[in-house]
């Protein structure tokens, strides 16, 4: 799939810079392979609502972030999760765990904009799940707020909707929230959310 031309932090760039970079990568794809890919992977997994629209307008059908999770039929095609498997995160024990991981299906995650200005950091996070998820009250969520991974406080608004209390700002380039739910058979359901911290606040 396409991963941009420069592999720079495009999410912080002007629209014209993003479009020029993607257009160049598509020209190279077409020149060497005779066609363009339907798949796009955001550089560093970073995207904004604006970046998503650009990718849609270029005709890509699927786009991947870098938030962990399992793809299922309910996921936004332009915010697909992926587990990194590489020289740092590629041990066979971890791989065996990942292939047995199940999706944690949700209707909506708020805020929809994952590109955070300083005034929106920390974000007010709300997750609305589908009605048929068993034992949802046993879910656990963790975040790297304040640049330190910790167990996050969650509060249920109703049986299917919860808030994740992020009390400290995300520090650095990315903020992450991971939620997991253990099934009776020992399998885990997993949901990851990634926020991008705006370069200029």
State each model region's role.
Residues 1, 52-115:
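Active-site-adjacent pocket scaffolds in enzyme catalytic domains
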Residues 1-51, 61, 74-81:
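Metal-dependent polysaccharide deacetylase catalytic core of the NodB/CE4 family, i.e.
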Residues 5, 68, 130:
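Histidine- and/or cysteine-centered catalytic micro-motif in compact active-site loops
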Residues 25, 63-65, 164:
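Sparse, context-dependent recognition of short Cys/His-centered cofactor- or disulfide-binding micro-motifs
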Residues 30-33, 37-43, 69-74, 149-166:
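Repeat-unit-sized solenoid/scaffold elements
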Residues 40-43, 63-65, 85, 125-127:
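Long, contiguous hydrophobic alpha-helical segments, chiefly transmembrane helices and signal peptides
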Residues 42-44, 49, 64-66, 144, ...:
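Intrinsically disordered, low-complexity regions enriched in small/polar residues
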Residues 85-201:
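Terminal accessory/targeting
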